[in-house]
């Protein structure tokens, strides 16, 4: 373990939150951090590796072997806790909601287990575990308070998640998350807009509207056009430069949403819409309430209204019963759709889902072969689509931590309006994350673009000011924020993908 300077004011306790899974969990972890800081804890320095006084695991139940990963990480902390009796370990998130009765049995050194519906209880549960000297397991079966009413420690100074709903009313057969996060519950529009306006007042210039099934917003109040109205309302907020959303369901993707995207200047020309399969037979088995023609029809309408839109998707390969003909239908749909990028997953059983007990589970070697064919096809399409960007002039929002080789190549990185990742030559003039630069694209790779010429223009922004202020004011009590561009699944070189049951949370 590296040597960490843990010097803090006497009596001040540090915390670390480890996040696994989807965007919902990332945003929930911001809330967990806010709750702990509100209770007097201080964030541990980056790289503390379990050296904090409180370590919180915010877990995912979608990824294969999520259980093994959690217990492996918990096991590595057991010796540290033996040496430091005052240390506390908490486990929350979807896996905690699912395995509430087994976590403390398998890892008796865990102090707190909490679920997806009661994250606001974490500080109280930690204190109760300390006083009573026994593990506290508290799982709520329904939402106690809308999470966005809780304190939040934002990870980025210039971009932010804004939750508009929680839960999901869909019943996809591969997905366990609706059972863990509950039925859909929408926030009041006024509360959402008030949060966005407050964020913009703090310097944020990009927001991502977040929901398990984001474009179903309004379903519990009976307004089928509530989401498109919300997009248009975002367009009226001064200082808000970029609006994104994730993830929509094709069933609820209506013409009024497409019109709002096209007619609201700060709604970015980008759509991440999970297809999951191109086979009507498989889509029916998945209990997805659309078919290939419907999905491709939505894409056609989006491109007619927004010609330069970048469209990305999620696809599951090897769903139970998928034949070679079914897989060829997926390949056909990918050729027709010409996605900017596809996040492709190999199906694996997830206990508790209907698909796990379906007949005709596909052999691993068949799934792997199909996966490789699909990835190769999409790589070719991604590269072809990116080549069309060469010669275009783009406005990029400068990002922090997006380019792994920026230091060695003397480049910076940013996101185009359509969320493509662009590496550009570092200008003589200082630019900060959150600032906007204008560049000309000179080269295309499958997962990124290059702008190797001089930067054409630099626009310093309030978002850049906010990043600089936070950067300067960081102290030992407030470690440097990650500053990642929060938003949709990114268009860029993907991380190595583990076998999984579905995309993201699996219910979009």
From Swiss-Prot:
NCBIfam families associated with the record: miaB-methiolase, MiaB/RimO family radical SAM methylthiotransferase
Protein's cellular compartments: Cytoplasm
Reactions accelerated catalytically: N(6)-dimethylallyladenosine(37) in tRNA + (sulfur carrier)-SH + AH2 + 2 S-adenosyl-L-methionine = 2-methylsulfanyl-N(6)-dimethylallyladenosine(37) in tRNA + (sulfur carrier)-H + 5'-deoxyadenosine + L-methionine + A + S-adenosyl-L-homocysteine + 2 H(+)
Binding site for [4Fe-4S] cluster 1: 22, 60, 94
Obligatory cofactor(s): [4Fe-4S] cluster
Protein encoded by which gene: miaB
The protein's name: tRNA-2-methylthio-N(6)-dimethylallyladenosine synthase
Subunit and partners: Monomer.
Organism: Streptomyces avermitilis (strain ATCC 31267 / DSM 46492 / JCM 5070 / NBRC 14893 / NCIMB 12804 / NRRL 8165 / MA-4680)
Main subcellular location: cytoplasm
One GO location term (cellular component): cytosol
Annotated EC: 2.8.4.3
Entry similarity comment: Belongs to the methylthiotransferase family. MiaB subfamily.
Cofactor note: Binds 2 [4Fe-4S] clusters. One cluster is coordinated with 3 cysteines and an exchangeable S-adenosyl-L-methionine.
InterPro entries reported in the protein's UniProt record: Elp3/MiaA/NifB-like_rSAM, Methylthiotransferase, Methylthiotransferase_CS, Methylthiotransferase_N, Methylthiotransferase_N_sf, MiaB_methiolase, rSAM, rSAM_horseshoe
This protein's record includes keyword Cytoplasm: yes
Domain Radical SAM core positions: 154-385
Keyword set includes Disulfide bond: no
Domain MTTase N-terminal: 13-131
